[in-house]
Amino acid sequence: MKNSERRKKNEAYLEFAQAYLERTQIQSTVNLAETESTPEDAQMAVQNTGGYNVKTELLVENDYVLVGSSSVIGRRQSQQDSVTIPCDTQLLLEEHPKFLCVLSDGMGGLRGGEQASACATQTLFDDYYRIMWRHCTHSYLDFFRAEAEKINTLVRGLKDENGAPLQAGATLIAAAVDGEELHFLNIGDSRIYLVRDGKMLQLTHDQNYLTRLMEKVRSGEITEQEALSHPKREALISYCGIRELSMVEINLQPLQLKSGDVIVLCSDGLYRLLSRQEMIDVLQETAEDMNLAAFKLTAAATDKNFRGQDNTSVILIKIK
C-alpha cells in the first residue's frame, strides 16, 4: 500500500475522531492535528481522560489485509480490556499473510482485571511470534491448547504488591490468519464473528451459565423465559485464572477465508449494546477503513448513553 493512500485513510480517521470527541465534549490528551499518521508507526491516535477514554491505533494495512482496533473505558473506573494487534512488519511472512490478533476482558477489582487481561494477551501474542510465526513446528490446535493452560496458570498466580493473590480473571479470544485460513481460540464470553456477504455469523460460543441453562431448556427442565431471566445467566463458567480450565474452544478445522470477509473480535461491552445489524451497517458504511469502522463501532456503543457502559473493545480484520 502506498504511503500517500495510508496517510489519506489515517487523516480521514483522525478528522472523524476529532469531530466526534468535540461533539461529545470529550477532551483528548493528543493534539490530533499534529499526530503523525506515518505507516511505520502503529501509534496511539486518541487517548483521553474524559468520560469515556478512547484508545485507537492507527491503521495497519498491506496488499492482503486491513486491521483496525478501538477501545473505550465506558463508564467504568479503569480499562480492563486489553487489545494486541500486529504492526505492519508482523503481518506477512515471505509475502504470505500470517499474523495474530488478541483481545481479553479482565475482571477482578481496579487493578486485577487490568493485569489479568494484559498478561493473557501479551503472553499469547509473544509466544505466537516466538513459536508459530517463522519456524512453526506445532499445529494451531496444540499451540492454542498449551497456551490456554499456560495463561490460565499465569493469571491464577498473579499477586498484588503485598504478595497476596489478585484473584483476577480474564476472557481471551485470538484470531490467527495464516494464508487463506483462520484459526481461533476462545475462553469466556468475548466473541469472534465472521461477516460475509452482508451476514454476521458468531464463530465462538459464550462460556457462561446461560449455556447450561439452555441445556435444561432443551431437556424440558425449565422454560426459555426462565433461562433468559435467570440472575446468574451471565456468570462465566470458563475464564483465564479459573481453578480448573475445562472449557477451551479451538476450531478443529481452519475456516477458509474469502476476499471481502471481515473478522470481528469484541468484548461483551460491544455486543451487549449493538445488534448484529447495527454492526453490519457500520462495516458497510466504512468498508475500506477498518480503523475508522472500529472507532465508529465503539462510538455507536457510547452513543447509546447506557449508564453502566462496560469497557468496550473491538478488533477488525478485513481480507482484501
Where are these regions (language model features)?
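PP2C/PPM-type serine/threonine phosphatase catalytic domain
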Residues: 1-320
